Amino acid sequence: MRFVSLAVGAALLGAAGASSISSNVGLLKANGVALGNWEAAYEKASAFVSGLTTDQKLALITGSNVESANGNFTPLYFLDGDMGLQDFYYVSAFSLSSALAMTWDRDAIYEQAKAVGSEFYNKGVQVVAGPTSQPLGRTPWGGRGVEGFGPDPYLNGLATGLTTKGYVDAGVIPGGKHFLLYEQETNRTSSFGSSGEGSPYSSNADDKTIHETYLWPFYDAVKNGAGAVMCAMTKVNGTMACENSDLLMKMLKTELGFPGMVWPDMNGQNSAKGSALGGEDYGSSSIWSTSTMESFLSNGTLSEARLNDMAIRNLIGYYYVNLDNGRQPTRQTTDVYVDVRANHSKLIRENGAKSMALLKNEGVLPLSKPHVMSIFGAHAGPIMGGPNSNVDVMGSGPTYQGHLATGSGSGMASMPYLITPYDALTNKAAQDGTVLRWVLNDTYSSGGGSSLVPSSTSSTAVEPSFENFATGSDICLVFINALAGEGADRTELYNADQDAMVNTVADNCNNTVAVVNTVGPRLLDQWIEHDNVTAVLYGSLLGQESGNSIVDLLYGDVNPSGRLVHTIAKNESDYNVGLCYTAQCNFTEGVYLDYRYFDAHNITPRYPFGHGLSYTTFHYSSLAIKAPSSITKAPKGNLTVGGPSDLWDVVGTVSARIANNGTLSGAEVPQLYLGFPDSADQPVRQLRGFDRVELSAGQEAVVTFNLRRRDISYWNLKTQQWMVAGGKYTVFVGGSSRDLRLNGTFFLWVGS
């Protein structure tokens, strides 16, 4: 893609002509958005568009070549995803976003995004189809939750914003997705007979739910430089998301001040008129044909101002990340040897280890040169066909018969190689002189009771079974996974075969460690209280270095610091949101997802949101709160890219002292939760800050959390804006949503 002979002139959008839209809502300049550092990109984009004919503008917004007096433009190239480039050789396979979120590490999230972005840039790809904020994880049965950052909007939003910034700084356009309320695979394109033939389901939610939960992360994306947003293939409140003017023109482009383009997910664009007027900016030429669009212009259905706005939005992200400087390498075919991986394997290994949460440890970890170690489960070793075997989750089983380290569909990376736990443990055993045995499937058990050396022979051979290998082992490592992805939702939150394997091994091995990699919440209660299950490592999908990351944790080369981004329940019935099988999917739970629902109904989880152990211990003290005595009820700032300017103002701080009172260096993740006055109608408490602090044994540090206006605001349905409630706020600081070690209060007087 290149601009050549670009003539820059001053051209702004013209006044709106007659249109079926009653106002200029959603048009960039008509909104009065203070563009800030987007202004230069806007001027370049509008100058280029000013010299185009109607046909050329239509070519631009449908992804065709444009040749004009102002220069030539070749279409932007869009590609998945956050875990690395799809369909290319010589690229890296990174941790999935759900794993990255489990690091609770701002630097890790940003640095991975920048590394991913650099590989896109150097392969000649302009638009990353990401970050994937949503599916948020409304239901633990959702198939694509693994691709996102989890169901807490604050954590999801921060990770979405940091990922967006990483892509921008790498020189590519972030294309945040999926907008909006796309939370399951079931019936995403299916028909419902006479109730909606051929239509996807409709996600129905009120404004409070939308703003406080699902729209929240997109504020962060827009604020940090999103140049594109993908509208979902499903409906919202009865209208296709890509034709929904309330979502696209009102919320995204006006409330959030989004300056970039909206483009559709697969099957997201259904009609020419609906998508053009609803807020889509880039679409299919088969739907937006020249004759159709010209007829819309001539009869006043589509205004010239809206067409210009669409064209400018297609270009503004390109200029914003400076792709017009001519430095990006030309895109090659996928198999051409252009190695863009740099030293990203080191980053992938580090982030994978940072992301795994130690849920349980009764002194068995870290390992230290065990004499005899056995490993069990298909998840420990490679799949027969290699790491890039096609994974079609439609109709597949709920587990993966090999080491699961990347997603499927849009969430599947292009693996250059895969280090499995079997690979990494073999190397470690060779270094330590450990006898290593393995059964690399989930169901191989033919009875047992044999000792390490059978009496019938002088060989060390043992009939392979769970019982035989577990008996006589110093340590038993059992690897299990849970599979789901694009195209199919989950059918279970546990697996009978895998759970039986864990119990069988534990019945015969005093030190059984379970290692779990999963696409979403995975229930553990079939074996978690077994006396011989002495440790559990739990995480998401870690990418090409997965086995090394896991073994670094098992042996203590890395001290665990990962934290859960979802609640692990004791029973499936403890979760309040299941899959929807009807045409109308009503989000009647409102904002009460995950820990917010568990807290509201006083349900005891197996492991709470934010939980994770370390090989050392930490002490919390010295809570200090600095809050204003008064504040205006609503934001008064100008509309900027990312919403009202003062919505982002820091209005208070909370600090606490964290001390490592153990014997090993480690990282703690202190978390800030906030309880609102009753008048705000909010959950019991909500995450409103966190940090990851590395401390040597005996070291301590003061951690400070900034409270922004948006962090103490709620969405007022009557006034249709963010408001601050007056009254008492309760502050909690601790190691999880249930491990709250410090608390205090502050009062706010709210003026007009």
UniProtKB/Swiss-Prot annotation:
Active site: D265
Catalytic activity line of the entry: Hydrolysis of terminal, non-reducing beta-D-glucosyl residues with release of beta-D-glucose
A GO CC annotation given for this chain: extracellular region
Coiled-coil segments on the chain, per record: none
One GO-annotated biological process of the protein: cellulose catabolic process
EC number: 3.2.1.21
Keywords from the named record: Carbohydrate metabolism, Cellulose degradation, Glycoprotein, Glycosidase, Hydrolase, Polysaccharide degradation, Secreted, Signal
Domain of life: Eukaryota
Glycosylation sites: N187, N237, N299, N343, N441, N510, N532, N571, N586, N638, N661, N743
InterPro entries on file: Cellulose_deg_GH3 (IPR050288), Fn3-like (IPR026891), Glyco_hydro_3_C (IPR002772), Glyco_hydro_3_C_sf (IPR036881), Glyco_hydro_3_N (IPR001764), Glyco_hydro_3_N_sf (IPR036962), Glycoside_hydrolase_SF (IPR017853), Ig-like_fold (IPR013783)
SUPFAM superfamilies: (Trans)glycosidases, Beta-D-glucan exohydrolase, C-terminal domain
GO MF annotation list: beta-glucosidase activity
Main location: secreted
Functional pathway: Glycan metabolism; cellulose degradation
Family stated for the protein in its record: Belongs to the glycosyl hydrolase 3 family.
PANTHER family: BETA-GLUCOSIDASE, BETA-GLUCOSIDASE D-RELATED
Role summary: Beta-glucosidases are one of a number of cellulolytic enzymes involved in the degradation of cellulosic biomass. Catalyzes the last step releasing glucose from the inhibitory cellobiose.
Name this polypeptide is given: Probable beta-glucosidase D
Organism the protein comes from: Aspergillus oryzae (strain ATCC 42149 / RIB 40) (Yellow koji mold)
Source taxonomy: Eukaryota, Fungi, Dikarya, Ascomycota, Pezizomycotina
